[in-house]
Amino acid sequence: MKIWTSEHVFDHPWETVTTAAMQKYPNPMNPSVVGVDVLDRHIDPSGKLHSHRLLSTEWGLPSIVKSLIGAARTKTYVQEHSVVDPVEKTMELKSTNISFTNMVSVDERLIYKPHPQDPDKTILTQEAIITVKGVSLSSYLEGLMASTISSNASKGREAMEWVIHKLNAEIEELTASARGTIRTPMAAAAFAEK
């Protein structure tokens, strides 16, 4: 078993970061996630948003890893459960693979919460527990997978910034469009009065 942890601070408020987290895929930084299906989404009586999603991923595994695990297939599936608490301002996301579970398990947990000293920033705490079962060189493979997770976490943070930029651009476009819509009738009314 290998445990990997990380902490990152986003220079954006919690509301922005959690909105981006829900819209993170697809993105050009991590093209291995090829599909996201929402299986269930509901708000509980306390106002928390619960989501259960299925992520389809396509991994380019090195041939040595394919031969060690005895699989040519590289499409894998991950189930993801998240809970967004708008009152406490926390988002907890847990994911686990549902493919190749007889050989490997990757359990990941992400927590997003406002920075305690700066409400315009968000802290992401990330942890992954990797367990390779029943193959020789399991500790080597666990280390290799931890390295891949670390690299993908970096890509994930880049993707979050990309989504946030995209969301901000959409907001600016909508705002400009709304201003134009408001000004047009006002301009027409002013023109009609002359």
From Swiss-Prot:
Phosphoserine PTM positions read 46, 51
Segments forming domain PRELI/MSF1? 1-172
One GO location term (cellular component): mitochondrial intermembrane space
Q: State the Pfam families in the record.
A: PRELI
Q: Which UniProt keywords apply?
A: Phosphoprotein
PANTHER family associated with the record: MSF1/PX19 RELATED
Record-stated family: Belongs to the slowmo family.
**The name this protein goes by in its record:** PRELI domain containing protein 3B
Protein species of origin: Macaca fascicularis (Crab-eating macaque)
